[in-house]
Amino acid sequence: MSALLEVRGLVKHFGGLNAVDGVDLDVNEGEILSVIGPNGAGKTTLFNMVTGLYVADGGSIHFDGHDLVGLQPHHICTLGIARTFQTVRLFPAMTVLENTMVGQHCRTRSGVFGAVLRLPRTRAEERRVLEQSRLALSFFGSRLAGYRENQPAFALSYANRRRLEIARAMATNAKLILLDEPTAGMNPRETQEMTELIGKLRDERGFTIVVIEHDMRLVKGVSDRVVALDYGRKIADGTYDEVANDERVVEAYLGKRAAEEAAG
């Protein structure tokens, strides 16, 4: 497998805090990579730099041959990276289908002029957006497709809102999807379903996936490889068993837990 995403020496400071401190990371094409670590380890900050929400203070990010540092989020989206967030970010009053279509804004080129005049190019683009959105929703079966596509997002269960965020990312026609804590707030049954779904995203739809997750059952169930961060630094990189048994990873988790218990 070739590296689709290459991160070298990545740095991000917030005041005197080194949120990400010299991280190297490769994501291979067709791989499911999990990024783990205690709260505050720099996981989401890493995602934010890859997707252009934060500008790196040092280091490099290359995706599919493109230098991402300094690019705007919409430009990075057009190159083939999509993401979800820790907290659900949908348009509650818009329908399931409309929320999915919104995800393709970075790939649409028809402006107001074309929309008003209903130019052929605009109509063709609208058909493409609609077809791509319904294809993404169909992956989730009756949970999002069929009659549900016309329901407002606020009417969905929490788990289905999470699924809708993933559908929106899929509809961008991305090569790489970044999932930030996709099972946060889910019960064990929903977590197991999400574990299976992430595997199918790669196996059936061909996405390369990086997932930030605290639930080790999901991490063990889906990961080809696991990277552990602590205090902004990479402390382990390998298979699930290799990382889970790494003394530095055990210390990072147990050390944080002991400190929390002492404070409580």
What is the role of each PLM region?
Residues 2-264:
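Glycine-rich phosphate-binding loops of nucleotide-dependent enzymes
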